[in-house]
């Protein structure tokens, strides 16, 4: 039975009826922390709809916790009416109608049954986390709903910006309905402690904490959790009445579950947690939250094909989620370890823009989508990231040259593995897969279950797809072909991408002779130099044999120490194996300049004021026409061979005139001169020079737009009554006194003459009595 004392209880009937009557069949539920949405909404939907209800949760511990809580509420065993599914662990039965599932399970289910025939409603909980899986599932669900008119979706979160989402789920004219529910029953007092260390804050709060209460401490990641734990242990914590627990996705699942155990009456509990405890989990007895203000995020370096773990300020939404943990049971407090005036971003960028999307792209190919623009995304993937993922999938034989998913690609989906690990598994090295998967740090029991499950799945894969390999290192190389690295001296290794990385310090200290070749499954790209966390040593013969058919011969023309050089190299990416100097020809100068531009940008080219003006005018033209801006300097750097190389033929230097002429030809200078002039004829007959500048948009001060600007002594615009325009955009007038001091800035001349000019005119007449001041008559001053 659903409790009637939850903040969300009075809204349940409205939620069900609004969803049933929603024209888009979507509903957004914005329910504050502790409203009871995860517990109460699924059973309410169960009573209102005939088929199954699926609720997606981003974390395994939340899946288990919610399934057990709902089952208890329904006075059932877990696996009865309410059950759960996650990788390696299911608890469902024939009578199960409500399933709490992890994200990857929903994707698999959609791939196997795109119409979800036995499901009435899919609930996407904690949607604000915007994982890759959730965004993909939502895009797939929008297509699945076209196959059935009785499939519904509820999007739930405590902190979410609803306007854009409701228009995406519906239309701009008819957005999806939004229901907002108040949550927290108890106030939370927020205190700002400044730069106090987390361990000191914990020790201070433990002294004030009553028995039977929990202090929940949010830290960026496992490194900080372990460091604070050590500091607390050194200070004498915990004692017989204080229990210290940690919560992080990398620790064993059994250890994670300990934080959900009930407290004893005499116990004070301190839980050191990552962001895993922000949502869905109800940690018993939390009355105090200590928030470090930081989060650990993955950032994908697309060019290098490596991820970089960064510690960043948490978002405002995240800070609200964290503080809300303290007000679920009684009046609580949140101690923020930063200053009140510190500025936080509203939300964290979605994972789809910052993480590895290789698996997502493979799922899309299996769905029948080969171009990301063919799916209706809430946030589209980055085009460069998509293209790099496709390139890697081709290297891994998951996609063929015709952009068709292969048997290897389908095997990856069946095995439930990242395409890289799938290749390792198909080589017959399941133990290596375990080591480089999330299960590598789990208990022995879980590891055995993972390996058994993988072996069972591998038996169903056709033998022709499997790869007979004897060496573990070669198996890993098959899955990480872009991560082969060569020793570059002093413990540094160079990758085909050009990135250099060092082996983790503790490991490096144990090595007497660094191997020539390694393959690196786990590496952080770093800011300027990466860090290698795990690797396999490659026998030089194996490396040589593997590279043999992958080496390419390239001719490079470039500047070295300001001298023009030409050489032929044998390489794999940026790993160079041999090079031979060649004679420089008269045509090589242009190629070298273009190579330098692509590498270093346009700064070394001689740009005069005329060329800079042309670039700004071309950008303005593109902006008004809604076209791609070919005048963007990053675009010009990439395309130097297209616009500059024809003008460099037979030359041995670059002049200002050459750069201008090349840009004028490439950007369509004649059309730009016609539409975006450098000089304008005012309605009083005077010709004046215009400039084009990047300025804040009048509608949105945070956005920069290009505007035509006219700086002019005010008498020179007498006799003009309407604001001049360029391509329909009003010219911004900077009106000056006879001494060229600023008087007014306006893009509405008629309004200026009527309302502002009379006061300015009085002052000008007093200061400059010999000048003419009738704005209605053209003046030669």
Task: List each language-model region with its residue ranges.
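P-loop NTPase motor module signature
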Residues: 1-424, 464-466, 470, 474-475, ...
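Extended active-site and interfacial segments that coordinate phosphate-rich ligands
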Residues: 113-128, 292-296, 305, 317, ...
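Charge-dense polyanion-binding interfaces
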Residues: 123-124, 239-243, 247, 252-256, ...
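Acidic, serine/threonine- and proline-rich low-complexity intrinsically disordered segments
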Residues: 430-500, 506-679, 721-781
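Extended hydrophobic-aromatic, low-complexity segments
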Residues: 401, 503, 690, 744-745
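Residues in well-ordered beta-strands of folded domains
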Residues: 83-87, 101, 189-191, 248, ...
């Amino acid at each position: 039975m659903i409790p009637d004392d939850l903040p969300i209880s009075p809204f349940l009937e409205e939620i069900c009826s609004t969803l049933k009557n929603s024209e888009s069949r979507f509903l957004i539920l914005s329910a504050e922390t502790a409203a009871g949405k995860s517990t109460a909404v699924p059973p309410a939907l169960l009573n209102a709809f005939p088929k199954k209800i699926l609720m997606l949760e981003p974390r395994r511990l939340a899946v288990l916790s919610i399934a057990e809580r709902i089952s208890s509420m329904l006075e059932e065993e877990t696996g009865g009416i309410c059950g759960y599914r996650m990788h390696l662990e299911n608890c469902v039965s024939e009578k199960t109608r409500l399933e709490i599932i992890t994200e990857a399970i929903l994707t698999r289910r959609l791939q196997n049954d795109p119409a979800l025939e036995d499901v009435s409603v899919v609930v996407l909980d904690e949607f604000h986390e915007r994982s890759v899986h959730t965004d993909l599932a939502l895009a797939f669900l929008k297509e699945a709903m076209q196959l059935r008119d009785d499939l519904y979706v509820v999007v739930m979160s405590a902190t979410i910006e609803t306007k854009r989402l409701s228009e995406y789920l519906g239309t701009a004219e008819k957005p999806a309905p939004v229901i907002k529910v108040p949550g927290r029953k108890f106030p939370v007092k927020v205190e700002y402690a400044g730069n106090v260390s987390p361990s000191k804050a914990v020790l201070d709060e433990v002294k004030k904490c009553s028995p039977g209460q929990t202090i929940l401490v949010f830290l960026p990641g496992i490194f900080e959790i372990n460091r604070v734990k050590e500091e607390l242990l050194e200070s004498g914590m915990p004692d017989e009445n204080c229990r210290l627990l940690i919560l992080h996705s990398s620790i064993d699942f059994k250890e994670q579950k300990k934080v959900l155990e009930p407290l004893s009456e005499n116990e004070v509990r301190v839980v050191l947690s990552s962001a895993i405890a922000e949502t869905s989990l109800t940690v018993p007895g939390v009355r105090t939250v200590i928030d470090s203000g930081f989060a650990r995020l993955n950032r994908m370096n697309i060019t290098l094909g490596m991820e970089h773990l960064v510690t960043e300020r948490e978002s405002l939404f995240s800070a609200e989620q964290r503080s809300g943990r303290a007000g679920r049971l009684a009046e609580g407090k949140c101690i923020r370890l930063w200053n009140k005036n510190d500025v936080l971003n509203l939300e964290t960028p979605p994972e789809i823009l910052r993480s590895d999307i290789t698996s997502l792209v493979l799922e899309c190919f299996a769905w029948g989508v080969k171009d990301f623009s063919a799916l209706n995304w809430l946030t589209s993937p980055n085009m460069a990231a998509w293209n790099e993922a496709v390139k890697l999938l081709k290297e891994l034989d998951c996609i063929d040259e015709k952009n068709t998913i292969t048997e290897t690609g389908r095997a990856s989906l069946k095995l439930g593995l990242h395409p890289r690990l799938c290749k390792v598994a198909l080589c017959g090295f399941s133990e290596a897969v375990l080591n480089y998967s999330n299960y590598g740090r789990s208990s022995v029991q879980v590891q055995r279950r993972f390996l058994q499950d993988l072996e069972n799945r591998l038996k169903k894969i056709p033998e022709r797809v499997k790869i007979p390999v004897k060496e573990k290192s070669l198996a890993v190389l098959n899955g990480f072909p872009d991560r082969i690295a060569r020793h570059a001296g002093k413990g540094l290794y160079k990758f085909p991408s050009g990135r250099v990385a060092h082996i983790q310090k503790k490991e490096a200290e144990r090595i007497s002779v660094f191997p020539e070749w390694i393959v690196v499954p786990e590496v952080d790209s770093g800011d300027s130099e990466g860090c290698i966390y795990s690797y396999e040593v490659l026998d030089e013969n194996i490396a040589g044999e593997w590279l043999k058919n992958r080496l390419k011969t390239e001719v490079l023309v470039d500047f070295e120490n300001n001298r023009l050089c030409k050489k032929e190299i044998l390489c794999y990416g940026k790993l160079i194996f041999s090079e031979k100097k060649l004679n420089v020809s008269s045509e090589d100068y242009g190629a070298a300049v273009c190579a330098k531009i692509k590498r270093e940008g346009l700064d070394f080219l001689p740009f005069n004021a005329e060329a800079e003006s042309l670039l700004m005018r071309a950008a303005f033209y593109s902006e008004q026409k809604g076209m791609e801006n070919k005048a963007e300097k990053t675009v010009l750097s990439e395309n130097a061979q297209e616009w500059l190389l024809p003008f460099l033929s037979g030359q041995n230097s670059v002049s200002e005139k050459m750069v201008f002429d090349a840009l004028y030809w490439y950007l369509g200078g004649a059309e730009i001169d016609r539409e975006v002039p450098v000089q304008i004829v005012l309605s009083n007959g005077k010709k004046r020079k215009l400039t084009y500048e990047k300025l804040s948009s009048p509608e949105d001060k945070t956005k920069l737009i290009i505007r035509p600007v006219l700086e002019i002594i005010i008498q020179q615009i007498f006799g003009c009554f309407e604001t001049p325009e360029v391509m329909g955009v009003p010219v911004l007038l900077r009106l000056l006194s006879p001494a060229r001091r600023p008087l007014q800035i306006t893009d509405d001349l008629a309004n200026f003459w009527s309302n502002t000019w009379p006061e300015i005119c009085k002052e000008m007449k007093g200061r400059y009595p010999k000048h003419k001041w009738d704005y209605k008559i053209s003046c030669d001053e």
